[in-house]
A protein has these predicted regions:
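Extreme N-terminal starter segment of soluble prokaryotic enzymes
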Residues: 2-8
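Active-site donor-binding segments of glycosyltransferases and PAPS-dependent sulfotransferases
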Residues: 8, 23, 29, 33-93
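A short, glycine/small-residue-rich beta-strand->loop->alpha-helix junction that serves as a flexible
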Residues: 9-24
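Short, flexible loop segments at the rims of nucleotide/cofactor-binding pockets, characterized by
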Residues: 14-16, 63-68, 120-127
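Short catalytic/ligand-binding loop motif for oxyanion handling, primarily in non-cytosolic enzymes
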Residues: 16-18, 45-48, 94-98, 111-114
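Short, conserved loop/helix-junction motifs that constitute active-site signature segments
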Residues: 30-31, 95-99, 138-139
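Membrane-proximal helix-turn-helix segments that form the acceptor-binding/catalytic region
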Residues: 76, 123-141
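Active-site proximal beta-strand in glycosyltransferases
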Residues: 86-88, 98-118
């Protein structure tokens, strides 16, 4: 891995659909170029195993742990790799100043505006929690 510019990507909530495709394409590009660090969902371990120029940290999709302590794995990763130059978070709020540049990609705009949309109560609560976390995280990005 080239250490000139250190990238840390957090795709830990992307293990299906379009998020998975974006994850694999990003993994592939960085593997063919400078290499990067990736936080990934452990469900896709077999899909990226052939890309050896990157370093991976796998986390499980534990909804209860994410509800009460989202991003719990980040301090341990930073302790291992040091402060990255760029932290890119795909759909996961940035809870503190992780890198020199913190980049947050909102993958679901529904979380920001649920008024007048018919949603099950559980989904509405999830969206409200995520909305609050996104708003709190803006100051770090």
């Amino acid at each position: 891995m080239n250490r000139e510019l250190v990238w840390l990507f957090n795709f830990s909530s992307s293990w299906v659909g379009g998020g998975l495709i974006r994850t694999i394409e990003t993994v592939r590009w960085f593997d063919n170029n400078m290499g990067a660090y990736f936080i990934l969902n452990d469900r896709i371990k077999d899909k990226i195993s052939k890309y050896n120029n990157n370093k991976y940290f796998f986390v499980s999709d534990n909804k209860m742990k994410r509800l009460f302590s989202d991003g719990y794995y980040i301090p341990k990763i930073i302790a291992e790799i040091g402060r990255p130059d760029v932290y890119f978070s795909y759909g996961i709020p940035v809870f503190n100043d992780i890198a020199i540049i913190n980049w947050f990609h909102i993958s679901n705009a529904l979380t920001l505006k649920t008024d007048n949309i018919s949603l099950p109560l559980k989904t509405r609560i999830q969206m409200l929690i995520l909305k609050r976390r996104i708003i709190k995280s803006i100051k770090y990005t």
